[in-house]
């Protein structure tokens, strides 16, 4: 089995999908988890205004609407959280995403004060936190906030990790990668777009240039620039297609380099890293 075949199998990516079937599959998955864990009453997710959180958020909202209808229990709710660092440049996109998602509850927690306090505390020890490291601190602070809300509201935190992100390890370890449940896992980037289109989303919600936007010295840095490869190339690879050798080398390089992100903390019995 080639490395490409191994990755496709591990991530569960299909070469093509029926968007409506995958929408149903994700909603049923989220519902089944709640039914198995009756002490859980909410799903919590940070909404950035990007494709992935918009899709996961709408799926979560539909899940809770079905749970209420089926059980008569109005405590089943989806909590969407805006988590800006100061003023977000594309706040209008985040508001458009919320308008589409129509969450039961919408909260805002600005992470600037807490993030800056952490940076100052580190710097006070004679270190100088880099802009890149600070960006990761922002992602982790956002997850701290989501778990704080989930803990108060009998909730589980939804993550937005999908196959095109997972293969490259393009997420912050213990940040956006530290969720409880991943309804988009198995989908590549273009398949996520197909689900949003099937859900009736305005195309501006899934055609905007993807960016983590964590680094202040590189505002709005496109994912594809940071990765050195396009999502179309990543998606083609995940669908089993032949892509150019340079792009394949880059993708497989990311897969190998970020293996630690896809594992629990390394123990003496692990050998994947050797």
UniProtKB/Swiss-Prot annotation:
One of its GO terms (molecular function) is metal ion binding. Deamido-NAD(+) binds at residues 140, 173, 180, 260-261. The keyword NAD applies. It catalyses: deamido-NAD(+) + NH4(+) + ATP = AMP + diphosphate + NAD(+) + H(+). GO terms for cellular component: cytoplasm. InterPro entries: NAD/GMP_synthase, NAD_synthase, NH(3)-dep_NAD(+)_synth, Rossmann-like_a/b/a_fold. Keywords: ATP-binding, Ligase, Magnesium, Metal-binding, NAD, Nucleotide-binding. It holds the Pfam family NAD_synthase. Its EC number is 6.3.1.5. Pathway: Cofactor biosynthesis; NAD(+) biosynthesis; NAD(+) from deamido-NAD(+) (ammonia route): step 1/1. It is an enzyme of class 6 (ligase). Mg(2+) binds at residues 52, 165. ATP binds at residues 46-53, 160, 189, 211. GO terms for biological process: NAD biosynthetic process. Catalyzes the ATP-dependent amidation of deamido-NAD to form NAD. Uses ammonia as a nitrogen source. Belongs to the NAD synthetase family. Homodimer. NCBIfam families: nadE, PRK00768.1. This is NH(3)-dependent NAD(+) synthetase.
């Amino acid at each position: 089995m080639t490395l490409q075949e191994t990755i496709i199998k591990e991530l569960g990516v299909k070469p093509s999908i029926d968007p409506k079937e995958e929408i149903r599959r994700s909603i049923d998955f989220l519902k089944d988890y709640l039914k198995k864990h009756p002490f859980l009453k909410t799903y919590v997710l940070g909404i950035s205004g990007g494709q992935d959180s918009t899709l996961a958020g709408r799926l979560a909202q539909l899940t809770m609407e079905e749970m209420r209808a089926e059980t008569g229990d109005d405590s089943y709710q989806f909590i969407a959280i805006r988590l800006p660092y100061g003023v977000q440049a594309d706040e209008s996109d985040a508001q458009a995403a919320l308008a589409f998602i129509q969450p039961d509850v919408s909260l805002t927690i600005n992470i600037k004060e807490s993030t800056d306090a952490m940076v100052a505390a580190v710097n006070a020890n004679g270190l100088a936190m880099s802009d890149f490291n600070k960006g990761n601190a922002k992602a982790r602070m956002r997850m701290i906030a989501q778990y704080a809300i989930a803990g108060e509201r009998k909730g589980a935190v939804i993550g937005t990790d999908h196959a095109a992100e997972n293969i490259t390890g393009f997420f912050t370890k213990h940040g956006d990668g530290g969720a409880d449940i991943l309804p988009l896992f198995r989908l590549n980037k273009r398949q996520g777009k197909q689900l949003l289109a099937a859900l009736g989303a305005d195309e501006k919600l899934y055609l905007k240039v993807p960016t983590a936007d964590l680094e202040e010295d590189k505002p709005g840095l496109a994912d594809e620039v940071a990765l050195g490869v396009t999502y179309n190339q990543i998606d083609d690879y995940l669908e089993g297609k032949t892509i150019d050798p340079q792009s394949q080398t880059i993708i497989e390089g990311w897969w190998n380099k970020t293996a630690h992100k896809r594992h629990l903390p390394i123990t003496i019995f692990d050998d994947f890293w050797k």
